[in-house]
Amino acid sequence: GLYITSSPGVLTGSDGYKMFLSNGTYNFYAVSDNFSTIPPTFTSGVSDPLFNGIDYLWWSAIQQDVNSSQINIPIVYGHVATQVVVELTGGEGITINQLVSAMITPPVVGATMDLGTGIITPATAFGKADKMGINGLTAQYIMLPIRHTAPMTLTLEISADNENSTRTYTTQVPLPDGELKAGNS
């Protein structure tokens, strides 16, 4: 079923959210996109195609004994996407006044998640450049996992040294051990 929580321990749902189970042993799974009220749809244990920019979360509780009228199972999500964080600092002879824009080349979209393991299959190709979120002199982007030997392209536009015009810098960001793994920054 589809359940929504706005505070710990309180679930609301559509189409009658109460879950009634016979006594037995069950495997429970939960997926969230930490973004909207509708997480990805799964068919035969595999998600619909996933997208960059979304903080996918996954949880499981395997072989849970249900043998009473009411049980509580705590859900502790883990991140299954990955994220890139770039923090700028001025060096010798330069003062950064503002990070104006940041673009990064994330993996192609369309990877899927396995419901039983929470694994998002890593992409093997880069997609189109996308805007990163900016907070002060820090840029951040959540993306699907990727495995590739080539680096990602990062383009930064900054205001520096109180100049009237901005400067644009492009650099190549290598993937640690050739991969941005799920749950890592």
Regions picked out by a protein language model, each given a short descriptive name:
Residues 60-152:
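Short helix-loop boundary/capping segments
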Residues 39-47, 164-176:
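Edge beta-strands of extracellular beta-sandwich domains
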Residues 177-185:
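A recurrent domain-boundary module in secreted/ectodomain proteins
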Residues 28-30, 86, 102, 156, ...:
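Generic structural hydrophobic/aromatic packing signal, biased to beta-strands
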Residues 1-93:
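Short, low-hydrophobicity acidic/polar segments
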Residues 25-33, 150-160:
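Short, aromatic- and glycine-rich surface loops/edge beta-strands on solvent-exposed regions
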Residues 2, 74, 131, 168-172, ...:
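Well-ordered beta-strand positions in beta-sheet-rich domains
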